[in-house]
Regions:
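N-terminal secretory signal peptides that target proteins for export/translocation
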Residues: 1-10
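Gly/Gly-Pro-rich "capping" loops immediately C-terminal to redox-active cysteine motifs
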Residues: 35-43, 52-87
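Short, cysteine/histidine-rich loop/knuckle motifs that typically chelate Zn2+
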Residues: 49
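Bacterial signal peptide processing site
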Residues: 29-31
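C-terminal capping alpha-helices of c-type cytochrome domains
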Residues: 90-108
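C-terminal motif of bacterial Sec signal peptides marking the signal peptidase cleavage site
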Residues: 24-27
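Sec-dependent N-terminal signal peptides
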Residues: 9-20
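The −1 position to Zn-ligating cysteines in a subset of zinc-ribbon hairpins
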Residues: 46
Length: 108
């Protein structure tokens, strides 16, 4: 049976940790969105009917000046778990559209 040197394994450890760190950080970054496109999406899909034209004066929760993470926002857009809030799966709204809408609401 072959014996492996622990020194050989330790030699690669910094490299493996660097790669792991890069993968973790790149997976956590918020996609870049265009607020102007997000504004169009907000109007086009009648978000203002419930959330109001400014995102803070409707029947539904306040959505302007968002403080939630992008990933939480995306989860709500995809499936809010509410019978009132429509679901927007990837077939209805692209990841870029979600990022645009998020950028618009963060900027309000």
């Amino acid at each position: 049976m072959a014996k492996y040197s622990s020194n050989l394994n330790l030699k690669w450890m910094p490299f493996l940790l660097l790669i792991l760190g890069i993968l973790i950080v790149s997976g956590c970054s918020t996609p870049t969105g265009n607020p102007d496109d997000g504004k169009r999406w907000y109007s086009m899909h009648n978000c203002f009917a419930c959330h109001g034209p400014n995102g803070n004066d409707g029947k539904a929760p306040v959505v302007n000046n968002l403080e939630m993470s992008y990933w939480r926002f995306e989860k709500i857009i995809r499936d809010a778990g509410s019978p009132i809030m429509p679901k927007y799966p990837e077939e209805k709204i692209s990841d870029q559209d979600v990022a645009d809408l998020y950028a618009f609401l963060k900027a309000k």
